[in-house]
Amino acid sequence: MKRLFVVGLGPGGRDGMTLEAKKALEQSEVICGYTAYADLIREDYPEKEYLVSGMTKEVERCHMALLAAQDGKTTAMICSGDAGVYGMAGLVLSLAEKYPETEVVIVAGVTAALSGAARLGAPLMNDFAVISLSDLLTPKDVIEKRLRAAAAGDFSICLYTPSSK
């Protein structure tokens, strides 16, 4: 079976990775990802083939990973935190429609919001909101509306990407 794992590495490398993430990386022949994330784990998986690229090359990286999987190599697309929270899972799934023979497996990771809350001794209880301040894909007025709504709801708010355009 042609398989692409989309793996959340957690908040900073091997210490924050789940056992499932480590297992997916061990099973993979190819690891694809942003250069800085690959550098975090390269020492632990030196025998793997690495396909890396720089920031803003997300679509290109997804295609590289999907092509490697399509060629029959079990592949892992790595991202920081959780693959589904501002990670690569959504983009991979949308592009995977062009690769119907490739099974995409999402491997959850620990988000920066949850890790940060734990380190601060401030558990996120009784509901919380996670909001990205990046206006690259979301208009600024929509972000501001979300912030006002979360504040009005008296939620603890975890903010991602504090700088943008």
Give the positions of each predicted feature.
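Class I S-adenosyl-L-methionine
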Residues: 1-104, 110, 115
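Beta-strand/loop-alpha-helix module characteristic of Rossmann-like adenine-cofactor folds
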Residues: 3-7, 75, 103, 113-165
